[in-house]
From Swiss-Prot:
Domain AB hydrolase-1: 45-355
Active site, renumbered: 151, 316, 349
Record keyword Cytoplasm present: yes
Reactions that this protein is recorded to catalyse: L-homoserine + succinyl-CoA = O-succinyl-L-homoserine + CoA
UniProt record similarity statement: Belongs to the AB hydrolase superfamily. MetX family.
Gene: metXS
Superkingdom of the organism of origin: Bacteria
Residues binding substrate, per UniProt: 221, 350
Gene Ontology molecular function: any one: homoserine O-acetyltransferase activity
E.C. number: 2.3.1.46
Function: Transfers a succinyl group from succinyl-CoA to L-homoserine, forming succinyl-L-homoserine.
Species in which this protein is naturally found: Janthinobacterium sp. (strain Marseille)
Pathway: Amino-acid biosynthesis; L-methionine biosynthesis via de novo pathway; O-succinyl-L-homoserine from L-homoserine: step 1/1
Subunit annotation: Homodimer.
This protein's name: Homoserine O-succinyltransferase
Length: 385
């Protein structure tokens, strides 16, 4: 299997206001995206990949010969890979509110002539899906072969199946959940408080002060990273190993796990925007499509039309297998076609990004079967695309 190679992002400007769930609107905006593979003649082989918290439109390939610019899901997407770009036309979109190109807090607010900062409106998963649908319209894609995502990306895929049931044939939801638990909301709030109470945050207008709330971002990332790993994985990687071989009897770094978390926090604070972090964690917290159906997930999913693949990981305690079980049961209650795989993997929530061959084979097999609908299957025989 080879990489897609060097890729370039594209952008599309929208001058029609986007109404948001909050009641606010974004008057005009830009979406940055990348595409891989070739769109077929009837536009029936398009797959939308939705990204998680700190990822972006850069799903696969590289921006140069430097491997450090490799896309965040390059092991999943590419020629001969589970989502095979020799067969599928894959789209990665950067969500509104992000800091990787699409309109967000770092951009100029046309109403003020200044950067949005903390004044960028709160966006939800459903708002992102609405903006993605507009991009699909502009690209001439009436129906996706699949919408796919892991973690927060999986929430977007699920929302697609609810909001636009006729616009996707397959919905692939990996390491995700139909709503956050109180514990998950608590983690997000502590992370936000770390940023909001950093003196360099300046009420979200830190750009004008020429500073970055690095300490808040560092702590937020450290906390988040703990939730992405499993206890077993941390024990195997770090255990109680000491950085210098003995206790220092101070408040610096003694343990290797401390060194690792601080490294992750430091790195994150150099490239991620604090306002974006606040926005995206709020979008996570607010996602609860069953809320409008009295909490009944079966009713929530009753109008879906897609076939589903759900994947969970045994040691993922952020979005545990029980959350996937809830979605599977609700879909079964609605007589939907569901494939479910629970992968015994030690890597916690981050397992959805890693090269577990059992996991990769599940996804590969699913997309191979889905492609039969396009190449000589029901779509080629004349079914609507």
């Amino acid at each position: 299997m080879t990489s897609i190679g060097i890729v370039s992002p594209q952008s599309m400007f929208f001058d029609t206001p986007l109404p948001l769930q909050s009641g606010a609107q974004i008057t005009d905006y830009t979406l940055v995206y990348e595409t891989y593979g070739t769109l077929n003649a009837d536009h029936s082989n398009a797959v939308l990949v939705c990204h998680a918290l700190n990822a972006s439109h850069h799903v696969a390939g590289t921006y140069s010969e430097d491997a450090g610019t490799t896309g965040w899901w390059d092991n999943m997407v590419g020629p001969g890979k589970p989502l095979d770009t020799n067969k599928y036309f894959v789209i990665g979109v950067n969500n509104l509110g992000s800091c990787f190109g699409s309109t967000g807090p770092m951009h100029i607010n046309p109403a003020t002539g200044k950067q949005y900062g903390a004044h960028f409106p709160v966006v939800t998963v459903e708002d992102w899906v609405q903006s993605q649908a507009r991009l699909a319209d502009a690209l001439g894609i009436k129906q996706f072969a699949a919408v796919m995502g892991g973690s927060l990306g999986g929430m977007q895929a699920l929302a697609w199946s609810i909001l636009f049931p006729e616009r996707l044939r397959h919905c692939v939801v990996i390491a995700s959940t139909p709503k956050l638990t109180a514990q998950n909301i608590a983690f997000d709030d502590v992370a936000r408080q770390a940023i909001l109470t950093d003196p360099d945050y300046h009420g979200g207008d830190f750009y004008a002060h020429g500073v970055v709330p690095k300490n808040g971002l560092r702590v937020a990332r450290m906390l988040g990273h703990i939730t992405y790993l499993s206890d077993d994985d941390m024990a195997a990687k770090f255990g109680r190993e000491l950085r210098s071989g003995s206790y220092q009897f101070g408040f610096g770094i003694d343990f290797e796990i401390e060194s690792y978390l601080r490294y992750q926090g430091d790195k994150f604070s150099t490239y991620f925007d604090a306002n974006t972090y606040l926005l995206i964690t709020k979008a996570l917290d607010y996602f609860d499509p069953a809320k409008d159906f009295g909490g009944d997930l079966t009713k929530t999913l009753s109008n879906t039309r897609a076939k589903f693949l759900l994947v969970s990981f045994t040691t993922d305690w952020r979005f545990s297998p029980e959350r996937s079980h809830e979605m599977v049961q609700a879909l079964v209650n609605n007589n939907r076609t569901v494939t479910y795989a629970e992968i015994d993997a030690p890597h916690g929530h981050d397992a959805f990004l890693l090269d577990d061959q059992r996991y990769m084979n599940v996804v590969r097999s699913y997309f191979e079967r889905a492609y039969e609908e396009i190449d000589g299957g029901s779509l080629k025989a004349g079914a609507s695309a």
